[in-house]
Amino acid sequence: FRYKLLAQEASIFRKLTVEDNLRAILQTRNLSKKEQDKKIDDLLEEFNITHIRTRLGMQLSGGERRRVEIARGLALEPHFILLDEPFAGIDPLAVADIQGIISYLKERGMGILITDHNVRETLQIVDRAYIMNSGQILLEGDSDTIANSELARKFYLGEDFKL
């Protein structure tokens, strides 16, 4: 059973190209250079980042960086992925892009756990959500249950919250 944590903080190598960021991870696996090249091409295509292949990590926008981090994490072929604040520090178009990637990963059967304070963006894509207060689970349920809960509104969402 393999899992991958993608932290909120940038985790790509800033002075390496996107391609070399992917290769750095693939070199930890027992793959030939030809197999690495094929996997890199596949990941670049799958996550729509072929056009930034030769750009340095420090030159990427927040959304591009997030897509590269996800692709890099999936190079290890995990069964489960933990996303910490995936919507932090990215523009609205990138949010929609990351939501699409998460939905795609769900369709592939990958287990996904998201921790995020951007509740609206998160509730739009999850099957189940948990609201915590003081380290305890206050409420759990599907997105509609959470969004319509008086308890969630009182302690976290606010009275005017709408999905």
Could you describe each region identified by the protein language model?
Residues 56-60, 64:
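Conserved ABC ATPase signature
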Residues 81-84:
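Catalytic Walker B motif of ABC-type/P-loop ATPase nucleotide-binding domains
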Residues 23, 34-52, 100-103, 151:
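Conserved ABC ATPase "signature" region
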Residues 70:
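Hydrophobic anchor residue at the start of the ABC signature
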Residues 15-23:
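Short coil-to-helix segment of the ABC ATPase nucleotide-binding domain corresponding to the Q-loop/switch region
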Residues 77:
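Conserved catalytic motifs of ABC-family nucleotide-binding domains
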